[in-house]
Design a protein with these regions (language model features):
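Generic non-transmembrane alpha-helical segments
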Residues: 96-107, 208, 212-218, 290-291, ...
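ALDH superfamily catalytic-core signature
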Residues: 239, 253-331, 335, 340
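Rossmann-like NAD(P) dinucleotide-binding subdomain of oxidoreductase/dehydrogenase enzymes
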Residues: 146-288
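Single conserved hydrophobic/aromatic residue that forms the stacking wall/gate
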Residues: 1-22, 328-346
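N-terminal Rossmann-like NAD(P)+-binding subdomain of aldehyde/semialdehyde dehydrogenases
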Residues: 21-155
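Short, well-ordered beta-strand elements within core beta-sheets of diverse protein domains
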Residues: 57-63, 78-84, 169, 279-281, ...
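Residue-level signal for inorganic ion chemistry
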Residues: 54, 90, 112, 135, ...
Length: 346
């Protein structure tokens, strides 16, 4: 009943008021560098739009070379001590981060619902939960991982796994905290330091995550966040001589540019690029194949790298497919059991 009451308040006030209530303490025009929120070197404001109502829900500043270099040098300095921390120390900090994440779970849901425009109930069950599950899973893997395994039985040779160094992490808007957790948490776990550039279209979840990292007590400079677009900070990160690795999730076009830009510094490049396949449904497929296919497309408004957005159905079941599709409704993201306009509708 309490949860229903909260949702009724949200519906009556509108998501904009929910956003203000949740984020009034966070200055969206600042960057997180060397353990503190700092002003940008130059003001270059950018409106963050709530796609469900096309209203400005926040303002951020797009960083430049000076901001990015400051973050990189902070990460480079922190790496000298962070790389020497024990596995037990890093596990303890990540467990604290997980605890804080779960305590502020609803705030993260509000952030993603606002920046992405997706239904709040679905966001909580899928988007927000992915962050928690990834943190939990990486903690488990870190506890199990042997950083100094033997080479061969009876051999005097030794394998030593060492952190790569300073990592530039560039994440997309469609699964914001999912991708942030998939990049940031393993980097923290292995002793790397980093600069995160979340999508400028959906930056709120990343900034909230930075708050959580700060609250967990990670050393200054280990994690840094600079907002910008891909052509700005993304280009700087991929080509900077003091960045040892860049990890990017996004379009194939941008992936090509990052690979070329990183070549001169011979840094490691990890790419997860776009790609979808057709969904073919025959008349003798299992009974719920059409329904499941449509739901897989409409989930997250089709904005997932694995969404089967092309459905080819056998002619004899075409009308059934159309009927299933007609059951999908578009409405406000605070209403349950609906899909809503995502960022791609802008």
């Amino acid at each position: 009943q309490a949860e229903d009451g909260i949702r009724d308040v949200e519906r009556s006030r509108g998501l904009g008021d929910v956003y203000k209530r949740q984020f009034h303490m966070l200055d969206k025009t600042k960057f997180y560098i060397n353990g503190e929120w700092v002003n940008p070197s130059k003001k270059n404001d950018f409106d963050v739009i709530n796609p469900s109502n096309e209203e400005v829900c926040a303002k951020i500043t797009l960083g430049n070379l000076e901001d990015t270099d400051k973050a990189i040098q902070s990460a480079k300095k922190a790496f000298e001590t962070w790389k020497e921390t024990s596995k037990q120390e890093r596990v303890a900090l990540l467990e604290k981060l997980l605890k804080i994440y779960n305590e502020r779970y609803d705030e993260m849901t509000d952030a993603i619902t606002t920046e992405l425009g997706c239904p709040r109930d679905w966001c909580s069950a899928n988007q927000t939960s992915s962050g928690a599950s990834h943190i939990e899973d990486f903690i488990k893997r870190l506890k199990e991982f042997n950083f100094e395994p033997g080479f061969d039985k009876g051999s005097k040779n030794q394998i030593l796994y060492e952190p790569i160094g300073v990592c530039g992490l560039i994440t997309p808007w469609n699964w914001p905290i999912n991708q942030i957790a998939l990049k940031v948490v393993p980097a923290l776990a292995t002793g790397c330091t980093m600069i995160l550039k979340p999508s400028e279209i959906a930056p709120l979840s990343g900034m909230l995550f930075a708050e959580m990292i700060h609250e967990a007590g990670f050393p200054s400079g280990v994690f840094n966040l600079v907002n910008s677009d891909g052509a700005g900070v993304g280009t700087i990160l991929s080509g900077h001589k003091d960045v040892d690795m860049v990890s990017f999730t996004g379009s194939t076009r941008a992936g090509r540019l990052i690979t070329k830009n990183a070549a001169d510094t011979i840094k490691r490049v990890c790419l997860e690029l776009g790609g979808k396949g057709g969904n073919i449904v025959f008349a003798d497929s299992y009974p719920d194949a059409v329904r499941d296919g449509i739901r897989n497309v409409m989930s997250n408004s089709g904005q997932s790298c694995d969404a089967p957005t092309r459905m080819l159905v056998e002619r004899s079941i075409y009308e059934r497919a159309v009927k299933e599709l007609s059951l999908i409704h578009i409405s406000e993201p605070t209403r349950p059991l609906y899909i809503s306009y995502a960022v791609f509708c802008l």
